């Protein structure tokens, strides 16, 4: 189960939710094994960075428009936005420390 600190983004709220601050978005799907393995890491990052960065998930099956716009071909993919601009792309299952280091570079 997702942490209550992890937001859920949709095609309709994505642009407004990523427009300000540092926002990490996990693109995932129910059927994706690596996505399920990444979920606890995403939950932990949401807790660790609470107040400094927003952490969110976006189901690619339920929301196809945004993943298409960013040419997401494989999941899990994490996109990091800073004030509405794409700052970093992380593809595949990565350790928490690597994702945290990416966040730290933009704080």
Set out the residue ranges of the language-model regions.
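Structural micro-motif
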Residues: 23, 64, 70-79
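Non-catalytic, surface beta->alpha helical segment in thiol-disulfide oxidoreductase systems
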Residues: 82-107
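Typically the conserved alpha-helix immediately C-terminal to a functionally engaged Cys/Sec
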Residues: 36-50
């Amino acid at each position: 189960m997702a942490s209550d600190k992890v937001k859920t983004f949709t095609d309709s709220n994505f642009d407004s939710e990523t427009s300000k601050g540092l926002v990490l978005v996990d693109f995932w799907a129910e059927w994706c094994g690596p996505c399920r393995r990444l979920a606890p890491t995403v939950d932990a990052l949401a807790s660790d960075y609470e107040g400094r960065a927003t952490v969110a998930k976006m189901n690619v099956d339920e929301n196809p428009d945004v993943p298409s716009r960013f040419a997401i071909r494989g999941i899990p993919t994490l996109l990091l936005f800073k004030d509405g601009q794409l700052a970093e792309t992380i593809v595949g299952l990565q350790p928490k420390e690597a994702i945290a280091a990416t966040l730290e570079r933009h704080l």
